[in-house]
Amino acid sequence: MLIVQQFQKRSFIIPSLISSGLSYLSKDIRLADKMEDGELHFPKTEFEKSQNTSRPLFQRPEPNYPGHVPLYNFEKLLMFLGSSIGAFVNPTNNNFIVSLGESTAFPWVLNRLRTQMLNDPSGRQILKERPHMTSKSLNLDELKNYPDNSLGKSYFLWLEREGVSPDTRVPVKYITDPELAFVFQRYRECHDFYHTITGLPIVREGEIALKLFEFMNLGIPMTGLGALFAPIPIKSSQRRRLLSVYYPWAVKNGTICKPLINVYWEKIMKKDIDVLRSELGIEKPPDMRELRKKARSKKKQVA
Amino acid sequence: MFQVIRRFATSVSNVADIVIIGGGPAGLTLGTALKNSPVTKHLKIHLVEGGKIIEPLNSFLETPPPNYLNRVVSLTPSTIGFLDSIGAWSHFNQERTQSYDDIVTYDGVSGARMNFEHPDIATMVETTNIQAGLLSRLNELNSQQEVKLVIQEDTKVTSIAKDSITQWPTLKLSNGDSLTCRLLVGCDGYNSPVRHFAGIESRGWSYNRWGVVATFKFADTEFRFPTGWQRFLPTGPLALLPLPNGYTSMVWSTTPELAEMLLSLDETEFLSMVNAGTRLSTEELSMIYDLAKSKSPDLLEQIQWRLNLFAGKLKPADEENFPLQVSEIVTGSRARFPLKLSHADTYVEDRVALVGDAAHTTHPLAGQGLNMGQEDVKSLVGALERATSRGLDIGNSLALEPYFSERWPQNHVLLGVMDKIHKIYSTDFAPLVAARSFGVDVLNSLGPIKDFMVGRISGNSKR
Amino acid sequence: MIRHSRNLIKLQSVRYASTKGKENSATENLRLGYLSDAQNAYMDRVIRVDQAGELGANFIYNGQYLALSHKRPDLKPILKHMWEQEIHHHNTFNNLQVERRVRPSLLTPLWKVGAMGLGIATGLMGKEAAMACTEAVETVIGGHYNQQLRVLTNQFHVDVVNEETGVNTPTVPEEIKDMQKLVSQFRDEELEHLDTAVEHDAHGARPYWLLTEAIKLTCRGAIWTAERV
């Protein structure tokens, strides 16, 4: 009886459950696991000592090409969220568009583009040679002497009219595979040529129309997002013009024309631009700057 | 003079206990096993083969050809155990066999891989080596026994009919003889005349695929343990199986157009194509196929470009996930054969039994076709032994039926499984690819289940 | 505080073991290192799990003896012999646990009940089932002891610095060598039990594969848990 009274009533189940659950985190268990796996105190051979296999737990993977910044998936998601909001609110800041483009350029999209390039002889040549467009590689000084109505001359005139230069393209940083990064870089660099061949200016309205054209032709998600959301904050008269004139044009031409990613622009600079347009299957849309000037003068008249 | 008399006399029918039609691995194994077994060795057995086999097979063992032949099969440990038990394995040219411990199968679209490791999981042996070893053992048994197995080579069977009185199968041979037997065993391949004679239906379908075979030598860049590789492309699996001394036998099951294209390439292009097939993505491969079909002159350059790009992206640790590149081809080893699935409705009829390809044909993706035939032989010999020791008429369905009931369901399951694997891997539809890759990844990490699969395939499972 | 005193005890035992039977001139100038935290943690784990394991084996044989002794008195000697060896193993590890002040497995009551239950159940299923159970358990234990032996042999070096020359020659201390011998001997005895069980128709059990694989799985799970809890 006395012994029974001396026996203390203690809770047993809950504390032992907790301690057995938490014990997994205990240092002893982790150390003993490491011993079992042969990671500690194991005499290393000379070869193994020369291998530096120990890595800290969270280490960024190696860059695959110069300028590559490997991102984790959650970082890419954050970049997408930030850049999509930023591009909507402030589309003139190039960084947002660039980041939005790279964070939405999923591997399967770029893979599809690369397959398109692989199946075309000129596309294959571009993939093999990996040309980069700079003002030097395009020989801007010679372009002004090219025949009128050639692609080179039109490009030069367009550059002058809009006041831009081919050297301002931001290099691709966040795409993992080097070949797919090149494909995206090529798209960025050819963007000015798409302007030239369609004649669209670099005003907001022009960029939006060109985005839809690119989306129908290339399928890059950023262009689709741009075409969908960018017309929301612009002036209603511009939006009306966009939706009635340029969007139908973009849909029609983007779908039926040949994949523009395969065009080796640098090699066809001397070609007549109208011939090129008919070969590719593009009709020139109404000149946007003219339409805008007319609309402005009409408003002035009315006022 | 003897012959003149014979010509004018009514042809005397030879009578045998068992006539085996077909001198391929199945027929020779059956003959050897029957002669080896103390229960059945007294039976009078004739083996009829349409081609000349004795001289070529004997010379194969005496003066082996310098190059490995392109018909090579993968033998399971169970088959080798059986061949050993009938005393034939020791007669094989062992230096020309290659046993390997590792099989790697990987998905052509997603790269999901499965690794099977087991000591001596399979052994590669040339078909001629098998036949030669069996023939050698048969000659040895014949020299030791009174009742000899008669091999009639270069003799075609012109007709098979039922004898009017006894109902026993009677064959008319191309050399004028006629042969009556108690039991007729058809080991005569897919278009088995014996099966047609017995009126047995064989059901199945053509896979609309051709197996392209060739023998290569791996590039001598690094040491690898002999491994069997199989890449499941959407058009069909590409398998590289190890042979001795760094050689490898390739079986590429692919569509008829691609098979024709592969055979039309010259040797260097073919080598590059095979290297591309083991490494490059399906989009790159379809670009390469289109270039090859249109006979583009820069095919080699384009393949080399993509291979170099691939090699540049490959991390050193991942190099062992792909087979070595092939650098030489054994000239004249390129060939192709059509792939089809077929399964006979029954393996036994009154006084008729079917073994091997006459009973079933399958896709080579798991290397089971010949092994199934060997298991058939083992089972049939067991049934005949039991029948003989009980004094039964061996041609009677009662004696033969245990063979059918033992083998048919097992063969059917195996044929079905291989058919499903072929179908699952014949697509590059993204959701299916994701599902099968997930399944493969899960299965690859479940050791016990893989061991079970290996045990079933190699016939080693504990009963 | 407790860790410090434990290390002291370990250090003393290391030093004591090292000077056992060695010549004085050699040992006077040697400074022996401590076993590291990881090595101590692993030793604790070894003793804990082996104590629990031998307790389990003890109770399994106990249960089998109980279940089979009435129906199969011819098996009594062989079961008794194996049981007694397990009792000896269990006692050895009990002593080691107390000596080194290792926490025993918290789930010991569970192991007692489980092992007894397994012994009785397989005993009631018959001789072949009991032998198959023994075979399964001893197979797992054989592999388990082998793994421990591997670690004890390869990874239990301590720094032994010669005070004069300053040269460090990592050596395995004597007590660890004794531990290796113990584990090796016990492993051999367990494998002997396995052979005995196979001799006595373990493969005749029905359902063989299911029974052995289920018992192996349970044993592995129990070993994993006893190592940690």
From Swiss-Prot, chain A:
Keyword Lyase attached: yes
Pathway: Cofactor biosynthesis; ubiquinone biosynthesis
Enzyme class name: lyase
Binding site for Zn(2+): 191-192, 195, 207
EC numbers, comma separated: 4.1.1.130
Gene Ontology BP annotations: ubiquinone biosynthetic process
Keywords, comma-separated and alphabetical: Lyase, Membrane, Metal-binding, Mitochondrion, Mitochondrion inner membrane, Ubiquinone biosynthesis, Zinc
Topological type in the membrane: Peripheral membrane protein
Cofactor(s) needed by this chain: Zn(2+)
Name of the protein: Ubiquinone biosynthesis protein COQ4, mitochondrial
